[in-house]
Design a protein with these regions (language model features):
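HotDog/MaoC-like acyl-thioester-processing domains
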Residues: 1-13, 99-150
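Hot-dog-fold acyl-thioester-processing enzymes
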Residues: 2-87
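Short alpha-helix capping/helix-loop boundary micro-motifs
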Residues: 90-95
Length: 150
């Protein structure tokens, strides 16, 4: 379910949990496609037989997990009056647990700050990628974006 707010009121959400995404399964196909796109073909990700033998199965790339943030966050916050938004960067990223192929992940998002910047509003979000059935998250990232209103 999406949280709704007007562009002028987005700062009222600071300190609040924005929402939790649906679960998404990490498939070997997704891992292989990420390996192709990035050139990262390390065996722990793409050599299923060796990974099964040596580490209990293949794991997703940390950066694949991180790259899911825009997809998992889509629809969590609907800011009325926004004409465009851009990714601005990250302050902190930590990979705290590996995601095994076949597991499901979701994102929990909290708005940490909303500050005027370059004619827009810079949003700082804490994005926690959770693994179904695991206590420790896969990734915790503090992301920055800038939204512009009409």
């Amino acid at each position: 379910m999406s949280k709704e707010v007007a562009y002028a009121d987005v700062a009222t959400l600071v300190g609040q949990e924005i929402g939790v995404s649906d679960w998404v399964q990490i498939t070997q196909e997704r891992v292989n496609q990420f390996a192709e796109a990035t050139g990262d073909h390390q065996w722990i990700h793409v050599d299923v037989e060796r990974a099964n033998r040596e580490i209990g199965g293949p794991i997703a790339h940390g950066y694949l997990t991180l790259s899911l943030i825009p997809f998992l966050g889509a629809g969590l916050l609907n800011v009325h009056g926004v004409t465009r938004g851009i990714n601005y960067g990250s302050n902190k990223v930590r990979f705290t647990n590996m995601v095994r192929v076949g597991k499901r992940v979701r994102m929990r998002q909290k708005l940490l700050a909303a500050e005027a910047k370059s004619g827009g509003v810079q949003l700082t979000n804490e994005c926690t990628i959770e693994i179904e059935g695991e206590e420790r998250p896969a990734c915790v990232a503090e992301t920055l974006s800038v939204i512009y209103g009409s």
